[in-house]
Regions:
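Conserved helicase RecA-like core
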Residues: 1-195
Length: 195
């Protein structure tokens, strides 16, 4: 059983399994209506500053920040910690014991922001996440729906934020079309709004 199945694995199952069954609940890649999708367009060099500003704007944030690579994940987590944020990282270069320890701290809310790769976050089941932040959009729409699906669970609301570069505008439109949901275009909070 798998909540999500990558295309590569699906093709292997079709090749080697006799008459496999697939159970789909709802439309594939359908957007959860309890999640508000917001994107912020920023210059590439301003992505980290935008992330900090958004974390400051939502002081009670309890969420996952998704990055594209292990290296980026660790760098962003290190910067956040250095800048005084309650954060840690989750990626494939950590031992299983380290991952378990980080997840234990995150589940009991001793960590406010978990910076993670898609692979490390597969199957994460954490209650009450308020936000998912995409530090850049994933290549696959299915990855986006998986990321945003970490919040807004069990009838609760959630916010999926994407910090994008102008070159990613087309990806936003593609995701909107596939999940059949329009994103809100966010305006970066001012210093006055944060204080």
């Amino acid at each position: 059983f798998s909540a999500t199945m990558p295309k590569e694995i699906a093709s292997i199952t079709k090749k080697y399994m006799k008459d496999p069954k697939e159970i789909v609940i709802g439309r594939k890649n359908e957007g959860n209506k309890n999640i508000r999708d917001i994107y912020y367009m920023v210059r590439a060099q301003d992505k980290y500053l935008a992330l900090k500003r958004l974390a400051d704007y939502y002081p009670n944030i309890y969420g996952i920040i998704f990055c594209r690579t292990r290296k980026e994940t660790q760098e962003i987590a290190d910067k956040l910690i250095q800048d005084g944020y309650n954060a840690d990282s989750l990626h494939g270069e950590l031992s299983q014991a380290q991952r378990d320890y980080v997840m234990q701290k995150f589940r009991i809310k001793n960590i406010q922001l978990l910076v993670a790769t898609d692979v490390a976050a597969r199957g994460l089941d954490v209650d009450d996440l308020t936000h998912v932040i995409n530090y850049g959009l994933p290549d696959e729409v299915e990855s986006y729906t998986h990321r945003r699906g970490r919040t807004g669970r069990a009838g609760k609301t959630g916010i999926a934020i994407s910090i994008c570069h102008v070159r990613e505008k087309g990806k936003i439109r593609e995701i909107e079309r596939i999940i059949n949901k329009k994103f809100d275009k966010g305006k970066m909070p001012t210093g006055e709004q944060i204080c």
